A protein has these predicted regions:
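Conserved acidic segment of CheY-like receiver
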Residues: 5-26, 62-64
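Conserved active-site segment of CheY-like receiver
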Residues: 12-13, 93-98, 118
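Acidic, metal-coordinating helix/loop segments flanking the phosphotransfer/catalytic sites
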Residues: 20-23, 36-61
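C-terminal output helix
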Residues: 42, 119-124
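A short, hydrophobic beta-strand element within the central beta-sheet of small alpha/beta folds
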Residues: 61, 87-98, 106
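Receiver (REC) domain active-site loop signature in two-component systems and cognate sites
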Residues: 66-69
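Short, glycine/charged-rich "phosphate-handling" switch motifs in NTP-dependent
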Residues: 112
């Protein structure tokens, strides 16, 4: 049985950080399609099929920053967990925040992992 290709949705408002993630994925030879949303609102639109330009077909994996305008990462994750069509989405937090409160909020929302951005592709 062939598995469907997994699309990676990067939810990141910072252009430099988004480019760094893209380079790290290439360095790790991860060739999955990478799509970017600027914030949580745009990500939800893409996931729910209401975005004007992009609709993602499952399966997908999310890499979500915590600090973003309009709808932050924790708010996005909580919205996804409340949506019966999205609740099983695999989500990793990818952020510069090493704060315990952010880690607790993320794990309370059942993320698969919490990665602190270091700028090093080796740690990614």
């Amino acid at each position: 049985m062939n598995a469907l290709p997994v699309t990676i949705l990067l939810v990141e408002d910072d252009d430099v950080d988004a480019l760094t993630v893209e380079r790290c994925l290439k360095h790790a030879k991860i060739t999955n399609t990478l799509v970017r949303a600027q914030d949580g609102v745009e990500a939800l639109e893409m996931l729910r099929g209401t975005h004007a330009g992009t609709h993602l077909a499952a399966p997908y994996l999310l890499l979500v920053d915590i600090r973003m305008p309009r709808l932050d990462g924790i708010g996005l994750i909580n919205e996804i967990r409340r949506d019966p069509l999205l609740t099983r989405t695999v989500i990793f937090v990818l952020t510069t925040s090493d704060a315990d409160r952010d880690k607790m909020a993320a794990y309370d929302a059942h993320v698969a992992g919490y990665i602190v951005k270091t700028g090093s592709s080796d740690q990614f």
